[in-house]
From Swiss-Prot:
The gene is garA. The modification Phosphothreonine is found at residues 21-22. The modification N-acetylthreonine is found at residue 2. Coiled coil: none annotated. It comes from Mycobacterium tuberculosis (strain ATCC 25618 / H37Rv). The lineage of its organism: Bacteria, Bacillati, Actinomycetota, Actinomycetes, Mycobacteriales. This is Glycogen accumulation regulator GarA.
Length: 162
């Protein structure tokens, strides 16, 4: 009897077959995969007007939970891999206690609290930085966009009359 597939090796002592797969993707296909994260950021930008005065929003642009939103409405908001963090970022690239977002003198600061991989604002490493609307904060593999609402005491443009 002749073997029909001479190129395939068979282990005579086992019925296991090993199959390996290689995937190749077009660059435009990969950019389509990023589209939902970008769309989520755009919808968050349009919803920023509804934020309470003195608060801000962090939107995950890249990372395992892209599109997630975190409201910054406390004096200090912690971010890290520890389950007790206000912003829980579950990935090994994030330290247990990675960074804090602090509201001081009507502006938000991000402070690295001794993380292993560092905290970045607009791709620059920082120990502490004042955040401006649209800044990108990187914590581990997560990239978050910082969006501000109206500042405390600012008029939102609405009138009190009919």
């Amino acid at each position: 009897m002749t073997d029909m597939n001479p190129d395939i090796e068979k282990d005579q002592t086992s019925d296991e077959v090993t199959v390996e797969t290689t995937s190749v993707f077009r660059a435009d296909f990969l950019s389509e995969l990023d589209a939902p994260a970008q769309a989520g950021t755009e919808s968050a930008v349009s919803g920023v007007e509804g934020l309470p005065p003195g608060s801000a929003l962090l939107v995950v642009k890249r990372g395992p939970n892209a599109g997630s939103r975190f409201l910054l409405d406390q004096a200090i908001t912690s971010a890290g891999r520890h389950p007790d963090s206000d912003i829980f970022l579950d990935d090994v690239t994030v330290s247990r206690r990675h960074a804090e977002f602090r509201l001081e003198n009507n502006e938000f600061n991000v402070v690295d609290v001794g993380s292993l991989n560092g905290t970045y604002v607009n791709r620059e490493p920082v120990d502490s930085a004042v955040l401006a609307n649209g800044d990108e904060v990187q914590i581990g593999k997560f990239r978050l966009v910082f969006l501000t609402g109206p500042k405390q005491g600012e008029d939102d443009g609405s009138t009190g009359g009919p």
